């Protein structure tokens, strides 16, 4: 957090020197969004603080886009005029006199100082548009967890803001096919979390939520030759859909089962992509472990889904395998420890199913190399996520 605050101070200083500098506007907004994400993950800081930072970031990004758009239009016009002048010169060009040559050489010697200014391109506009979608995604994520911190007008405001972004996509991407997937993924991630916020606030029903979520992730640019990143994002969205329905005490257990099964399929496909990054591969295993525990949770009341009951032992066994793989592949000590602890949990769930015994929390905690306090916090997180029943005594 200290490094982010130092970066923010530097960018804000640059912004004071030149309030209309597009780079300074963009960079300041990016750091504000990153700080907001850190605050959202910190239970000791009110989410309202994150909300303020994100609103400021959106204002800066909006201003940045407007300036970039204007500069691009100016650049295109200048290029057009320069081409016209060049064409006219070619028609009237004559060999320079000796005196003209001496003047040109003198000018060349005098004009040694110049400033290089990076031109604004369509890529610049795309970068800013994607950043805006990402900021809106973070904002909606916070609202799904703490809807009470914002007035009721917030979601309609976000929808209106995002509709302007969507309208811009065809204009700025028509000659940039290599950026279309990136734009579509940032939009799909945003749509998913906006729908989740709408569902939790009662403005969107489960059927609409699922239908529009699916539509966002099945666009040709995402579903055809999908990357590991797009498939992992789709799987995360499906898991979030399951969690949203679970939080609403929905009786749509079959819908949740199908969504989680689809998430596992997406993650399996992602893991088989040739050349997949090891960090992404580790993520596919960790998320498949989670998805299998979520599927197992459907066997418990009040869902009591028959397919989950029938396959409970296999689901917990699958989770154990995926968590162990994730622990081996993960690059950081913390990630390894989390996956390892979840693997132990899955093993004890298998014991519980086969022997009909209570879950041995003490044995799970003692298996952790990070200490009992850390292990208990991890188990509480698993309960909060719905990976373990809320009735579990910790």
Regions flagged by a language model, labelled:
Residues 1, 19-39, 69, 74-85, ...:
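Amphipathic alpha-helical repeat scaffolds of TPR domains
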Residues 1-10, 34-120, 139-157, 200-207, ...:
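Short coil/linker segments at helix-helix boundaries
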Residues 2-6, 20-24, 48-59, 120-131, ...:
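Residues within HEAT/ARM-like alpha-solenoid scaffolds
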Residues 10-24, 62-78, 94-127, 164-183, ...:
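Flexible helix-coil transition and linker loops at the boundaries of alpha-helical arrays
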Residues 48, 75-135, 149-153, 340-342, ...:
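Non-globular sequence segments
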Residues 199-211, 215-224, 233, 237-257, ...:
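Long C-terminal extensions of eukaryotic subunits of large macromolecular complexes
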């Amino acid at each position: 957090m200290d490094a982010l605050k130092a970066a923010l101070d530097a960018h804000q200083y640059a912004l004071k020197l030149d309030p209309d500098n597009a780079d300074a506007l963009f960079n300041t907004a990016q750091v504000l969004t990153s700080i907001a994400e850190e605050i959202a993950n910190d239970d000791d800081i009110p989410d309202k603080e994150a909300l303020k930072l994100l609103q400021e970031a959106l204002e800066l990004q909006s201003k940045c886009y407007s300036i970039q758009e204007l500069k691009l239009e100016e650049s295109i016009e200048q290029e057009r005029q320069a081409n016209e002048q060049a064409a006219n010169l070619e028609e009237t060009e004559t060999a320079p006199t000796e005196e003209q040559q001496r003047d040109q050489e003198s000018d060349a010697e005098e004009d040694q100082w110049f400033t290089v200014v990076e031109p604004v391109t369509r890529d610049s506009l795309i970068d800013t548009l994607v950043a805006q979608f990402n900021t809106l995604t973070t904002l909606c994520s916070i609202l799904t967890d703490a809807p009470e911190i914002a007035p009721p007008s917030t979601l309609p405001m976000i929808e209106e803001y995002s509709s302007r972004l969507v309208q811009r996509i065809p204009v700025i991407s028509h000659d940039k096919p290599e950026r279309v997937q990136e734009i579509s993924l940032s939009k799909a991630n945003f749509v998913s979390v906006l729908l989740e916020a709408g569902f939790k606030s009662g403005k969107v029903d489960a059927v609409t939520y699922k239908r529009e979520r699916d539509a966002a992730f099945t666009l040709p640019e995402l579903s055809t030759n999908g990357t590991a990143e797009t498939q992992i994002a789709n799987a995360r969205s499906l898991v979030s859909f399951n969690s949203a329905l679970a939080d609403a005490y929905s009786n749509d257990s079959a819908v949740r089962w199908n969504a989680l099964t689809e998430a596992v399929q997406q993650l399996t496909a992602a893991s088989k992509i040739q050349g997949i990054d090891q960090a992404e591969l580790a993520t596919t295993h960790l998320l498949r472990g989670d998805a299998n525990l979520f599927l197992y949770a459907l066997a418990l009341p009040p869902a009591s889904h028959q397919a989950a009951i029938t396959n409970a032992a296999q689901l917990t066994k699958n989770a154990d395998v995926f968590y162990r793989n994730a622990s081996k592949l993960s690059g950081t000590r913390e990630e390894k420890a989390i996956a390892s602890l979840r693997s132990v949990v899955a093993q004890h769930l298998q014991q519980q199913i086969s022997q009909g015994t209570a879950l041995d929390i003490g044995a799970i905690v003692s298996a952790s190399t990070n200490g009992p306090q850390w292990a208990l916090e991890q188990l509480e997180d698993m309960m909060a996520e719905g990976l373990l029943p809320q009735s579990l005594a910790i």
